Amino acid sequence: MPAKTRNVLIACSDYYGPFYKDGENTGAFFLELLHPYLVFRDACFNVDIVTESGKIQFDDHSVAGPAIDKGSKGEEFLSYDDHIASGPELSKAEKYVLENKDDMFWRIVQNSKTADEVNPDKYDIFFVAGGHATLFDFPKATNLQKLGTSIYENGGVVAAVCHGPTLLPFMKRQTSDGSVSIVCGKDVTAFDRVAEDKSKLMEALKKYNLEVLDDMLNDAGANFIKSPNPFGDFVIADGRLVTGSNPASATSTAKTALRVL
């Protein structure tokens, strides 16, 4: 009998618009899709990508400036040593994928699905990538919220990294006491207030009336755990819920999701 095909669904923001004070736009964060994709691909999982609308554009700071050539743009990302909210510089392999549009990664991106067309029964892992764009669209992405909840209730693993946990408070399960978020009573982490402040992005959050994730997740009943190093690799697993604190945690978050599964 052939082995069962294992499937991962990577969810990301479909917002692409103003955020940074240098005039650049936020969007889906490149490495937070690429790194999990590479982990799941190497584990022989089939990978699909989904957004609420099916559209994806990458955060300008995640595909240019400090992520590739430090100092060329995005100066606020260069304010905290060399760790920066965008994570390390792209490696040669990562640059190759970014520049080689024939790579399978780009085929999956170009064939991204809309949330309302996806069958949740197909997927073992629901992985949520970040980028500040999630703060704009995830609270209203009702089909994406329902999709992730269904995968979780089917016994799947839900993982989210950096600003990806923005979706989690809106993923509701039914209990005898009514509807509660899947993070209620769970240990979680995410890109927190300290990281936002050290990245000098609090002003932008206030400008666009966006909530910091510490508050959002605590308000949903989660036990928020801060990373000891705002830009260091940090992952929390609580049952079938896995969260990572920043872009540097994307690979570890994906690997932990596989171990939990």
From Swiss-Prot:
A single GO cellular-component term on record: cytoplasm
Q: E.C. number, please? A: 4.2.1.130
Homology family: Belongs to the peptidase C56 family. HSP31-like subfamily.
Annotated Gene3D superfamilies: 3.40.50.880
Name the UniProt key words of this record, in alphabetical order: Lyase, Stress response
Does the keyword section mention Acetylation? no
Any GO MF annotation of the entry = glyoxalase III activity
Q: Which domain of life is it from?
A: Eukaryota
Q: What does this chain do?
A: Catalyzes the conversion of methylglyoxal (MG) to D-lactate in a single glutathione (GSH)-independent step. May play a role in detoxifying endogenously produced glyoxals. Involved in protection against reactive oxygen species (ROS).
Q: Name the active site residues.
A: C162, H163, E196
Q: What name appears for this protein in its UniProt entry?
A: Probable glutathione-independent glyoxalase hsp3103
Q: Name one Pfam family in it.
A: DJ-1_PfpI
List the SUPFAM superfamilies: Class I glutamine amidotransferase-like (SSF52317)
Q: Which reaction does it catalyse?
A: methylglyoxal + H2O = (R)-lactate + H(+)
GO terms in the biological process aspect are: methylglyoxal catabolic process to D-lactate via S-lactoyl-glutathione
